[in-house]
Amino acid sequence: MTDAADPAPGSGPALSPRRGGWLDRIERLGNALPDPVFILAGCILVLVAVSVVAAAAGWGATNPITGERLVSVSLLSGENITRLLVEMPQTLTRFPPLGLVLTVMLGAAVAERSGLFAALLGGGVRRLPSPLLTPAVFIIGLFSHHAADAAYVVLIPLTALVYAKAGRHPLVGVAIAYAGISGAFAGNIIPGQFDLLMLGITAPAAQLIDPAYGVNPLGNWWFTLAIGVLFTPIAWYVTDRIIEPRLGRWTGGFPDGVEEADALGVLSGAQRRGLVWAGVVALVVVTVFAALVLWPGGGPLLDLSEQGPRRLAPFYGSLVAAFMTLFLGCGWAYGAVSGTIQTHRTLIRMMAEGMRDVAPYIVLAFFAAHFVALFAWSNLGPVLAVNGADALRGLDLPRPLLLVSLLGMSSGLDLLIGSASAKWSAMAPVVVPMLMLLGVSPEMTTAAYRMGDSIFNIVTPLASNFPLVLIICQRWQRDFGIGSMIALMLPYSIAFGLAGIALVTAWVSLALPVGPGAPATYSPPAAIVQSQVGPS
């Protein structure tokens, strides 16, 4: 444990001098992996080969819902080759997450580039009293999931400066901010783009076994909210009782070239007025969408022909437009008042730059879309699901153990493959239908996957923002290395992992709803029940 803080920024010993051979091996293995796009391309080639073998062997199953005989189909059949080549553009454009991400990013790009996200994050951190700094920063980190990479660029360095000004070690600020942004990425207070993305991948996977099944974008809200509530005191305890005592108090100054006022990002009068107008626009947008649901006699976003939560299906479907409108309107209002958006041409340029930033995702989506489509054409998804469900049913494992196993699998993969959507695109067509046949809802399966996927984000050098956070730490302590970073963040990963396992186990055991209109359990149609009990 360090008893005295560094005398000045950039000096002093690293957090931990120990270097583990296992870390070097993981780093070498991770660096040897290709880009996620090539991983998906490889998965497609493997899928084609498996489909050929399965079709030749006559591998199949009986759909327990419809009674239909499912037969594996070779992807090298003439029909599938023609379908692949003719429908290639439609395969990409029909990929559900692509439209969701592009639509929301049109608005989010304006909110980010106008400075709205930075002003909101900065303004929230600067006003925090020192005793409540740790939990407040963690909660702001949860909210900042909507700001994407802006949270790493703005909140983490800003929090380090705020902690240093308060006489606390700046790396403590880095640790709690990074834990909130990335370590607790599965949790959130308000659903956002990532919910749309992940549940958008889940929907077609669920429809492999139940074509009528619908997944709404809020399907994980109660679970992600519970993560935020549970992880906040845990992160507070780990920070104040483990991380900070080890680092000690800070007696140094600010890094070279950083003035205190500039470092803390003091808002100008125009920026403060911009935040006020952004708040007004947010209130208007929320009011309009609420009126479209709650209008007397039934609003346009309420389906009066349905009963219960299904009445809100049009509202759930409109959330993509709601997020886009909210980000666009608030960002435009803030930028127009603060001076970052001078004309409508500036607005259009920001939206275009947002599309440029998601270009790598479009490339990934092309291969993910074709993997999902080819999986469906081969019939391997439902065949694997039915046979896998039969095998698991024979083992008679409890549902909590099944979901904890999925959590562990996604955690292990996260050490090597950073893209949550790429991994879920490959896993969902198998695990979602399989667990549906065992009574677990697609939303609960997605929630368990997301929990596991976020635990090791903060300790794997392969995470996309890990190098950025490491550089921020090195501004304060020059010899701070990868091992130091692992040692700094590992207590959070261990604590979050244990808490996550407990939460998933309790949630599915109590059959709590995962989100609005999204139960933790799945009740198959009568046909599947009959197939399990046999004829009377």
Please place each PLM-identified region on the residue numbering.
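Intrinsically disordered, low-complexity non-transmembrane regions of multi-pass membrane transporters
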Residues: M1-A32, A61-L76, E244-R273, A520-S536
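Hydrophobic core segments of alpha-helical transmembrane domains in multi-pass membrane transport
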Residues: L40-A55, V101-A109, I140-L142, G180-A184, ...
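Hydrophobic alpha-helical transmembrane segments of multi-pass integral membrane proteins
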Residues: V101-L102, P129-A160, K165, I362-A368, ...
